């Protein structure tokens, strides 16, 4: 979208201008350009902080009621490694999830597994201090946390591990 010549975009967009290529949606907030949503669909999505706060509220409600699962199976070795490398248990993981805020939100992804393409996966990041299991040092660990909230409100924590690359945060 072109600027109106003043360097500003039309006010009708409230500083949230989304553009789309074949797979990539980009948002402009003020002068900041962020890639946020990766869909191959022909629609533009608009997410605001209230949307994420609502989503997190539903996730936290499920977690508080133990209506969730943190995946630690053979396909989720990175999740297992977090629990092997640091002194962390399910209780601490639950505390971390319950401490998430909209400011920790990074992006929404489409589930790429065949038959589940309609599902949306929400990615968050969180810096936490954890004790290394093989040492005496505490370390600030940047976590990558990805949720799938199913239609029945059950939450699957698909990813809960150290970030492999720095995340871009949507509201920061």
Stretch-by-stretch model annotation:
Residues 7-9, 13, 21-124:
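Compact soluble domain cores
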Residues 16:
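Extracellular glycan-recognition regions
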Residues 102-154:
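Functional cores of ribonucleases/endoribonucleases
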Residues 147-172:
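A short, surface-exposed interaction/processing loop segment used at functional sites
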């Amino acid at each position: 979208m072109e600027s109106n010549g003043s360097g500003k975009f039309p006010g009708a967009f409230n500083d949230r201008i989304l553009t789309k290529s074949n797979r990539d949606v980009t948002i402009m907030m003020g002068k900041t350009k962020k890639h946020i949503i990766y869909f191959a669909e022909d629609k533009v999505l608009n997410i605001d902080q209230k949307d994420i706060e609502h989503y997190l509220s539903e996730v936290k409600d499920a977690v508080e009621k133990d209506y969730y699962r943190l995946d630690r199976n053979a396909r989720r070795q990175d999740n297992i490694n977090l629990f092997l490398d640091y002194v962390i248990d399910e209780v601490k993981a639950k505390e971390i999830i319950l401490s998430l805020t909209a400011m920790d939100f990074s992006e929404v992804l489409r589930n790429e597994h065949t038959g589940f393409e309609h599902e949306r996966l929400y990615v968050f990041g969180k810096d936490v201090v954890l004790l290394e299991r093989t040492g005496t040092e505490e370390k600030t660990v940047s976590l990558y946390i990805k949720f799938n909230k199913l239609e029945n409100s059950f939450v699957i924590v698909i990813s809960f591990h150290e970030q492999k690359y720095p995340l871009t945060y949507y509201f920061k």
